Amino acid sequence: MTKRYNNANEAYEAVLDEILQHGIDFGDTKAIFNCGFYIDNPSDKLITNQERNWSQNYASAEWYWYLSGDPSVDKLSELYGRVPPIWDRMADNRGEVNSNYGYQWKRNNQLSYVVNKLRDNPDTRQAAISIYDAKEHDKYSKDTPCTYAVQFSIINNKLCMSVYMRSNDVWYGFCNDQYQFASLQEMVADMLSIETGWYYHHAHNMHLYNNKL
């Protein structure tokens, strides 16, 4: 049975515990595979676990960076005051990254496409955004997007969303990723004048780096 959690923090703590108990050694991580679960209240997206010491200020800056659609890490620095080391390492020689998901969902007007599809037909199965793009493989030498796709459905007049990822680090990645995707879900629901429903999160490889064990 697919697991369900009330909010993001509950999901984080449960998945972290599962990795610690059942994860296998995989490179420089402990990992579990095909990890999928529902978050029933995705708007409850703050990570309150004290050991994690998660920063809403950073997550909010990252969200506005995504909204800008600007893949430059300089834009993130403008919003947050500095560039976190992980983004510095992933930036290409132009100072740009492929994992600015806002840049990806604006590509080919994908976000507008999704909203229009849902407005035209609430029962559509075509309201999907592609993040990973095989046509961009030559750009993925330093930064390969962790997310494949995001799909939306209106169920009982609520906007439900599924996120599919090739890889997700529970400590750094999931805590911020779920915040960004839940914010996207809220934004699309607002455009459609409906409430949000569940958020389903699936990672082929969900892991914790060994330096966090």
What are these regions (language model features)?
Residues 1-213:
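Terminal, non-catalytic protein-protein interaction segments that mediate quaternary/complex assembly
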